[in-house]
A protein has these predicted regions:
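Single conserved hydrophobic/aromatic residue that forms the stacking wall/gate
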Residues: 1-11
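Short glycine-/polar-rich loops that comprise or flank the Walker A/P-loop
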Residues: 7, 65-68, 120-122
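Class I SAM-dependent methyltransferase Rossmann-like catalytic core
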Residues: 12-18
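N-terminal pre-P-loop "Q-motif" helix
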Residues: 19-26
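Conserved S-adenosyl-L-methionine
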Residues: 27-106
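Active-site proximal loops enriched in glycine and acidic residues that flank catalytic Cys/His/Asp
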Residues: 45-47, 56, 71-76, 126-128, ...
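SAM-dependent methyltransferase catalytic region
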Residues: 84-167, 172-176, 181-184, 188-190
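Conserved NTP phosphate-binding and transfer environment spanning the P-loop NTPase/kinase superfamily
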Residues: 140, 160-162, 169-253
Length: 253
């Protein structure tokens, strides 16, 4: 009863409830018994309608903490006869995402004075194959005319954001870190964790682009191999960083 009522508060306009949701009140009680620290991370590997996220945000709003949550859920398809399917949600994951949005908004609306700094943002990821092409061929199997086909080792359907988050995982950078986009020398650049990592995956990257990034003195700088405007830029790449930011760790995809 309390579970459906709690979810109903968030989905009251949808005309139906999620089947068998966990009650927010129960999750909050369990989290309290766990004696969580103010910056702890809560994991839920059967997240369903994202009640755990709702409970964590509610607790943060009450005591000013900054706990985070990681939710994992298989993309189970909703019953076509259900109310949530009729409302446009195709998987349980989509329901959970909308639940988090609405719950966060509702918490802020109910306590505007005490939730000004409450972080209700979240990111959604899915398990996928590598962004990199499978280019393992024996020399005897490759003809000279085919070499241009292997100039770019990144799959054509992958976005700059896909590459960025793969790099963050490879470097052990928290996926909840701040990510800012800006233009440097006419190229889109990602600045992660206030410049700890700076990445540029655009095409036609010039010496000036590399120099502008090096002058920011990031701990990590990442570029796309095929993104360099010409061989000269690739040849000068290391020297530019040695001149302006020798301590920066450089990586090329």
């Amino acid at each position: 009863y309390y579970a459906s009522r709690g979810l109903g508060d968030v989905y009251k306009r949808q005309g139906g409830y999620f089947s068998g949701p966990k009650p927010v009140r129960l999750l909050r009680r369990l989290l309290t018994l766990a004696n969580l620290g103010e910056n702890d991370i809560v994991l839920d590997f059967f997240s369903g309608s994202a009640t755990t996220a709702h409970a964590v945000m509610q607790m943060n709003s009450e005591d000013g903490s900054n706990r985070k949550f990681i939710l994992v859920q298989l993309p189970e398809v909703c019953d076509e006869k259900s109310e949530v399917y009729k409302a446009g949600y195709r998987t349980i994951c989509e329901i959970g995402e909308e639940r988090i949005r609405r719950a966060g908004k509702k918490i802020k609306e109910e306590s505007p004075l005490t939730t000004t700094k409450l972080d209700i943002g979240f990111r959604v990821f899915k398990v996928d194959s590598s962004n990199m092409e499978d280019v393992y061929y024996r020399p005897a199997d490759v003809k000279q005319a085919q070499l241009d086909l292997f100039a770019d080792n990144i799959k054509p359907d992958r976005t700059p954001e896909d590459l960025l988050f793969q790099v963050m995982l490879d470097l052990g950078i928290t996926l909840s870190s701040s990510v800012d986009e800006e233009m440097l020398d006419g190229r889109k650049v990602f600045s992660v964790a206030d410049g700890y990592l700076i990445a540029c995956f655009d095409k036609d990257v010039t010496d000036e682009t590399v120099k502008a990034i090096a002058k920011r003195h990031p701990f990590y700088a990442v570029f796309r191999d095929s993104g360099m405007a010409n061989d000269s830029v690739m040849a000068n790449f290391e020297q530019i960083f040695e001149t302006y930011s020798p301590q920066t760790q450089r990586k090329v995809l």
